[in-house]
């Protein structure tokens, strides 16, 4: 078809066209420079480094996932290998273990684990919602302090910055209190030294800091920098903070009943011991692979439930309270800087 379009017309001699006079045949087949640059710009970057980085990331994820279960998976693999080798090489009698009881036991075990994990997740999610309420109430408290407290003539009321510093100390001490740890030394920068010295003499230093803030507001009311309506509004916010703290302490001090933790772990261990015995007759040398995969899933689910049931303790899925406290501190610093033109809190 293309040859027909380029054929010589009748009555006309074939010859080079005007725009082809200065172009030789080898040069006519070369791509246009602009086209070459466009193709070069549109080419994707080399995939070698990105591919290596992706493989390394996946490898680290697999190692982290395997390490999450811990030594339980390793001992399970050894047990599976021992059962398989003993059956395939040394055992002369066949094991005719029906799979129906094993299937029913596995189904009942999954229901039990799901019920326990659902209760554990509800505790974790409630703890996260309470810390979210703590963030919101902290912003409300800072906003009310900065806007409702009256300033003396010609200067900014220093109690505003003092209350914000005390609140940063409060949330950090609360995070340590929920972990069962003493108040960190960094809090010294936010509260008076004599007040911090009482840290070891009380069983709830975070609540003492909140009580001290309420006492400061009462002094401001007596000094005429607050009226009764604004004081009541600030006190209502302090009550919201105290309610959130009480909810967190309820979760921290009331663990799941012991059977919720012990029986799922016991049943999973027994099931993992029985699985290779029931599968070795049909799977042979592939028994360790199948049994270890099944055991890994059950052990991982059990470990997740164990971590979620204690949301404030150090684990893979703990509530990131330090990060939340840093968020509250940054929010209060920004609010103070915008309202008072001050520097960092503390």
Go through the PLM ranges and name each one.
Residues 8-13, 26-29:
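Short Gly/Ser/Thr- and charged-rich N-terminal loops/segments
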Residues 144-260:
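Structured inter-helical modules in multipass membrane proteins
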